[in-house]
Amino acid sequence: MTVFDASALLAFLSAEEGTDIVESALESGGMCSTANWSEVAQKVLAAGGDWDLSRALLLSYGISLEPVDADDAEWAAHRWRAGEGLSLGDRLCLALAHRTDDEVLTADHTWG
């Protein structure tokens, strides 16, 4: 299963380059942490988008929303490094992937 970073879902919703890759992964099933889900909602709303429509579209693919648990939060905290590019949301996405032993799909080029 695929763990979706907020950037991948936002790229899909915005029809950016790589949308076909994200859609294919969505069709195969996947999950998103509730922290990243909040980030997607915030960015859609801040851009003046229709969150209800975006939410319905993403959920129509059967994406699973996974809560952040204490172990995820602590795993993410241990990976914080001053001056490095991974945000809390990024680290919580990686924590979910670590917990579930799944691959992450991101559109964030700073991940390398």
Where are the model-predicted features located?
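Short, well-structured N-terminal submotif of metal-dependent ribonuclease cores
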Residues: 1-32, 44-56
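Histidine- and aromatic-rich ligand-binding microenvironments
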Residues: 4-5, 32-35, 86-88, 108-109
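A generic structural signal for short hydrophobic patches within well-formed alpha-helices
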Residues: 9-10, 37, 111-112
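Short, polar loop motifs at secondary-structure junctions
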Residues: 15-16, 108-110
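Active-site neighborhoods of divalent-metal-dependent phosphate/nucleic-acid chemistry enzymes
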Residues: 64-109
